[in-house]
């Protein structure tokens, strides 16, 4: 049987368990026709590139499928009918890797390096911290006290 990879995006207001139940439904459809699920990854709640059906975020799920083309057609029909699924895409692949996908490996790399690191200084910042009072520094450079302003002359 040919191999397929399917990515589906579910609405952001559903829970992870509901997304897993959609994947379980797909798995039951495929296994009923003699196919198998080779890979299953939950990518988490991610920001969409643009709004889809008034949603800015969605739960992503990757499925590696081993099924007949007629079964894939039925799975896609069921996904179209499911209101929780915003979008899906199924493509035919030569092989399904057992290693985690690039999306999952990138998430772990971000955690290891502290995500983004410290914020660099802005274009117009002098490097001083906010709330820095430079009056003490000015007085030290001027070499005088407040009494040397010439206001005491009467």
From Swiss-Prot:
UniProt keyword Cell wall biogenesis/degradation present: no
Alphabetically ordered keywords of this record: Ribonucleoprotein, Ribosomal protein, RNA-binding, rRNA-binding
Molecular function GO terms recorded: small ribosomal subunit rRNA binding; structural constituent of ribosome
Region (Disordered): 107-154
Disulfide bonds: none
Composition bias type Basic and acidic residues, residue spans: 125-154
CDD domains associated with the record: bS6
One GO cellular component term noted in the UniProt record for this chain: cytosolic small ribosomal subunit
GO biological process: translation
UniProt KW rRNA-binding keyword: yes
Similarity remark: Belongs to the bacterial ribosomal protein bS6 family.
Role summary: Binds together with bS18 to 16S ribosomal RNA.
Protein name according to UniProt: Small ribosomal subunit protein bS6
Species name: Granulibacter bethesdensis (strain ATCC BAA-1260 / CGDNIH1)
Organism taxonomic ancestry: Bacteria, Pseudomonadati, Pseudomonadota, Alphaproteobacteria, Acetobacterales
